[in-house]
């Protein structure tokens, strides 16, 4: 009931203003009696992924809490994990406003945020300050003004700084809103990046006597051959996981709607089938050697089950969470327990 009221108010506001209000409110109320307004108890449904055991298979996707300001509040809602970020080595403002658009009739969202964040050092402070023991993945990216050819340096800087504070690290090379970023998904650039990241991971594991798994987040706008090439690179470089998928540049199912022609990545219900197809193809190519975290267009328990059936071991929600609220977490977990 509370979420429906809050949603009604926030949906009258500019989307980005509403987002900042939500994150700020959650930050203020976390670890206080006010968590009763949105907190809930979720039945245990443990799942093992990348050598880690999560209390349930439903996580919050990256992008909602970029700077890790409201982690404890999302823990109260019952998420099995939270993926913060995308974070970059240096703070950056992201792209020009407006850059976030609702497509309410389609339960979709278009964003061209551009990795706006307060920088990795600020994120680390927030990770240290969190009071709960929720699993936190850290999604890392490159700064906009870093040339693509030098992009791996930004990823390595972020890895170095977040390593001790992350349950796992997600390497984001699939956002459509940073010029040239998706080129890192192909050919020599991909192999060089994954090799450098794996080398760094092993160095940090030896230095800190702690192994932190690494996952690669990929786009939905890939051919079968491109998915096969990415899978081969993941296996070759012994990555621990894959996250599929990010937002899409396609506009299937939203033509004619207000805001549908805005540039940026489309998420939410219009992405459901495409992301599931990519998960299925990726699972075929990975042959069970690397687990997949499924994300993209999960708007119901049925959508989540389709991701599991396609080959995902765990799922994440974002746009569906905005449209459905915390109840979606419980619905997915309950359905997962029964499957």
Swiss-Prot record:
Record family assignment = Belongs to the dihydroorotate dehydrogenase family. Type 2 subfamily.
Role summary: Catalyzes the conversion of dihydroorotate to orotate with quinone as electron acceptor.
What compartments host this protein? Cell membrane
Coiled-coil boundaries: none
Cofactor binding note from Swiss-Prot or TrEMBL:
Binds 1 FMN per subunit.
User: Which cofactor(s) does the record list?
Assistant: FMN
* Root EC class: oxidoreductase
- Topology in membrane: Peripheral membrane protein
What are the entry keywords? Cell membrane, Flavoprotein, FMN, Membrane, Oxidoreductase, Pyrimidine biosynthesis
Q: What is this protein called?
A: Dihydroorotate dehydrogenase (quinone)
Instruction: Detail which positions bind FMN.
Output: 62-66, 86, 139, 172, 217, 245, 268, 297, 318-319
Q: What organism does the record attribute this protein to?
A: Shewanella baltica (strain OS185)
Binding site residues for substrate = 66, 111-115, 172, 177, 246-247
Pathway listed: Pyrimidine metabolism; UMP biosynthesis via de novo pathway; orotate from (S)-dihydroorotate (quinone route): step 1/1
Q: Which HAMAP family match?
A: DHO_dh_type2 (MF_00225)
Enzymatic reactions: (S)-dihydroorotate + a quinone = orotate + a quinol
- Keyword Membrane listed? The answer is yes
One annotated GO molecular function is: dihydroorotate dehydrogenase (quinone) activity
